[in-house]
Amino acid sequence: MHAIAPRLLLLFVLSGLPGTRGGSGVPGPINPPNSDVVFPGGSPVAQYCYAYPRLDDPGPLGSADAGRQDLPRRVVRHEPLGRSFLTGGLVLLAPPVRGFGAPNATYAARVTYYRLTRACRQPILLRQYGGCRGGEPPSPKTCGSYTYTYQGGGPPTRYALVNASLLVPIWDRAAETFEYQIELGGELHVGLLWVEVGGEGPGPTAPPQAARAEGGPCVPPVPAGRPWRSVPPVWYSAPNPGFRGLRFRERCLPPQTPAAPSDLPRVAFAPQSLLVGITGRTFIRMARPTEDVGVLPPHWAPGALDDGPYAPFPPRPRFRRALRTDPEGVDPDVRAPRTGRRLMALTEDTSSDSPTSAPEKTPLPVSATAMAPSVDPSAEPTAPATTTPPDEMATQAATVAVTPEETAVASPPATASVESSPLPAAAAATPGAGHTNTSSASAAKTPPTTPAPTTPPPTSTHATPRPTTPGPQTTPPGPATPGPVGASAAPTADSPLTASPPATAPGPSAANVSVAATTATPGTRGTARTPPTDPKTHPHGPADAPPGSPAPPPPEHRGGPEEFEGAGDGEPPEDDDSATGLAFRTPNPNKPPPARPGPIRPTLPPGILGPLAPNTPRPPAQAPAKDMPSGPTPQHIPLFWFLTASPALDILFIISTTIHTAAFVCLVALAAQLWRGRAGRRRYAHPSVRYVCLPPERD
């Protein structure tokens, strides 16, 4: 009685520990045992179709044989067997093996499966059985013991061993081929198993024995709750300490070479029933939404599991190959936009009064038809253009077509420089995006003035003007007028004449040419009107436009024949004060000039001005004096040949040597003192005795 009580107490304690069937570590069957799981085609209930943890089988007892075993003398080769299904799910591939040892005898078994691809023969599962009953297939219940299950993929692996068969999840059209090696006593059974989903039947690569299977694979329902929360992952997938190979890489074996436990990178310590549940859980996580709890979906169409957020094992994107060879493989949003050809690059200096311009390396080709002036023979000759005195700023206006989208976009003010632009001044008046319409209404109401008798010489070297010869269809020649509207002939696409670049008057600001854009009604023709040139009423007179003031931005050519439609028809602009602008109003001589709105300063640093200045030269950046090297650093001369690091190492070596020398001297002195004291004690330990003969005493 006293011996039984401790055993009962120990059994009671062990029954409550985590990891046992009756404890709280791993729960029992949560769902009914396969009562709600059926094949989509109406086949019988599958005992392996579940996705929750079960502990129905006894656990493994130890590791498999570490050494690589040789092939037995007798090898039985089976014909390849293939199965094709219409839907996805879990499929049990059973090898065609019938003889399992002699009756009334025991045998040992070794089951190994390989996954075959075009370039690799990868071992995926390995298990050994011992003490199996003859006449029955090896399993955890018919054998006395079995080893851990070694896995070649994962974690966790998507395949599972069911006795001597292979449980495979299928969900895509790609066919999979497996090789099995089952050793039963002294016989080795070898063969191939093939499976696919989708299609009308076995494909061209299927074995001859492949046929359409009845029904279809089973689909496990999603378990309620979180049954795998209490199952440690080390049970069903842990690193194999005896693995000989590279981690996270397939282990490929030569043909007909048996695998050893050292060829598989992972090992599972859980029983077979738990590993089957892991395979079902992996399938529903990869191929089905997790919110469909307890719902058995209908027949899945072929290829329904290929896409979507739950598509299993998507192909690895080949970023390097796409970026190197295939331009279409690169995302167009990531690709940098190609810098187009601009008319000119403009920038503004915040410290100076006059804006500066940077030349563009690639000039814009302007067709001759676009630059040809529009002339109507029936139109009355208008007054010739006039010029301003040499000390005043000479400007030119060209009629261009501006779309409503372009007028709605605001752009920073800039001035087109004739000296820096490689095109003529007339070519600089092409339309562009991002510029407003600056037509003047007051110029259309003012009568023309008397032309000047002389024409000042041009000052531009890049845009040298050519004199215009008066003809029967042209207006009298004249230099560039400083008006905001068409002083020169407006270009049209149907005119055979060519445009002559205007001349610029000499002066302190003769290099700066302000370009104004006006809007004309397409389909009409007329003559260009000349704005007034009186100093008091001229919009760019000395009282209103001082030298160096910013001018309207130059238009930018965008290309396309539709932008030049109706341009240069010579129609007077509408009388609209909103389109006149502040710079084109007649100033009052008795009042100070109106305050001009401050120019919009660029917010980007020089050299990063966006599409307007792709080739803007940067100012030379000078490094601070403290960052500039003063001269070559003298090479360190070590105190000893073995000290080559730094002068600090020399000092540290000297200090350390001094300390150690002093310590050594102290130790030697202490040892000498102790030795001297011990020698003195030894000398006085045995004192010499002398006997002296005393004389006798006298009475």
Curated annotation (Swiss-Prot):
One of its GO terms (cellular component) is virion membrane. Residues 1-22 form the signal peptide. Residues 562-578 have a biased composition (Acidic residues). Residues 23-650 are virion surface. Residues 323-336 have a biased composition (Basic and acidic residues). Residues 448-459, 467-482, 544-554, 589-605 have a biased composition (Pro residues). Glycans are attached at N104, N163, N437, N512. Residues 348-359 have a biased composition (Polar residues). Residues 376-390, 403-447, 483-531 have a biased composition (Low complexity). Keywords: Glycoprotein, Membrane, Signal, Transmembrane, Transmembrane helix, Viral envelope protein, Virion. Glycoprotein G is much larger in HSV-2 than in HSV-1. This is Envelope glycoprotein G.
